[in-house]
Structure formats: C-alpha cells, structure tokens
Amino acid sequence: MLGLFKKKVTVVTHNGSFHADDVFACATLSLWAEKENINLKIVRSRDDNIIKKADMVVDVGDIYDPEKGRFDHHQRGGAGEHDNGIQYASFGLVWKKYGEQICDQEIAKTIENKLVLPIDAIDNGVNVSKNLREDVKEYSVAREMIYPLRFSPDGKGFEHFIEIAKIILKSEINMLRQITDQQKRVEKEIESQLEPEILILNEDIYWDKVVTSHRKIKAAIYPEPDASWWCAEVARDDLTDYNSNRASFPESWRGLRDEALVNISGVPEAVFCHRAGFFAVAKTKEAALEMARCALQN
C-alpha cells in the first residue's frame, strides 16, 4: 500500500543512440529515487512538449538549471567545468547535485574523480589516456560495453545498461565505505605497533594506501580471508608503480612454490613467491613474518 503514495518523478532523456554519460546520469537519479522512496519514471524522447512537462531532463533540452531539474550540456557555452577544467557532461551535472545525497561528501568526491570525470571527458571528446603499447589497447566499459546495444530499436539496451551502471555505482560506494573504515583500523594498528618496519595485521584489509604515508614500514603480513594461509607483501611508495617497492623478496625465490621454495628459502612453511618479488605466501603467521624479514634484508 505504501507504494501507492510514493512521490512520482518523471525524467526525460533523449531517445536514439545513448552513451555512458546519460546512462550513468539516469542510474544516479534511480539510486537517489530509491533512497528517497520516489517512484521514478524514465522517458526517452526529444519531443519538446514531453520535455517541458518533465520533472527532470537529462542530456537533452539545451538547458542547465539544477534547481529546475534541467541537466543538459549541449547548449552554446556548455554547462561549466570540473575543477580540473574538464567540461561537464550530463553525468557530472547530475552527480554534482545528487552524489552527496546518495553517499557522503568524501565518497562522492572520490567517485567524481574516479568515474565521473573520465566519462564526462569522453563525452566531450577529450582523451584522458594513451596506449603505452601499440599491440595492447585499453578496454573501456564506458565505450565498449555500451556500443553494441546503444542502437537497439526496442530501447531495452538503455534499460539494461542503467541496471549495470547502478551496480557499478553501488559497488564503488560500498567499496569506498569499506576502505574508509578499514584504513582507520590500519592507522590504529600502525600507532599501536609504533610504526614498525613490518606491519602485522590479523585480518585482510586495505592497508597499502595508508602505508604509503608511513615511510618506515617496508612490508606487511596478513591472513587470507579464510585464514588458511598468511601473506607477506612489500609496501610501495606509489600504488600505481611496482618499481617503487620499498623491499623485495630474493631473486632466487621468485616464481617458486612448495618444496622448491622451502629448499631455497630455508622457511619450512613457505608456499609461494610471486615471480615479480613483491608478494609471498606461507602456511603460518610466523613463516610469513620470517619471509617478510628476508625481504627487508635482501
């Protein structure tokens, strides 16, 4: 019965082919509506009469006026820019108003930088990356996944990708909430262990980003989620650069496992060492700690 009394909001976006910005803009509004217990209806049309009657208009209509629910960026002069100069597309305009209503300010800003900015940039014809190798191309969800269905005559492709976009947004929000909570716990561990060279964690949580600002820490050990194995991993100055490792496991260990690794390392419970030398696995906490110490001495 409660559903009968939901506030109803109609959103109009353009029909025809679609792109990531209008898909994610509508997905954002759908998540906002779910949180606010609003009955949201999405209509795809370029008819001026339908657009005028809509409660919200996204990526069509040539008007940007968030107070009136208008979120287009195609008009002369555009609809403004992000702080870094990238022009807003419809996703960015909608996220600017509703992102913090779906999640908190810090998470909304992170999602803007991670997801909104590249989609807005692509929609405005701005390249944000280049291939470092000619024989390997980057796979973009924003482009490759949407393209095959964006011309679907029955419009089902658009509905399908709104659901995918909602899953992506929910996943990002939930992940960032977990990371924020876990990083606070890591900071407490670092403080309680007096910023050690080897950080000992009793759970598998997001530690690596926190450790980048604690230069004394060279490695961490932590259990697998099911506690069947213990992992030893070196810390990095830059999480995007494996050349910034603060330590490394011995060259002679790399790529070995089980008996071969036990024989060369002298650690009876050693299980595996990654061939790049930044990660190793042991059967026990004590063995993982011993392997981490070897990495620091290497």
PLM segments and residue spans:
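Glycine-rich, Lys/Arg-enriched anion-binding loops that position phosphate/diphosphate groups
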Residues: 126-235
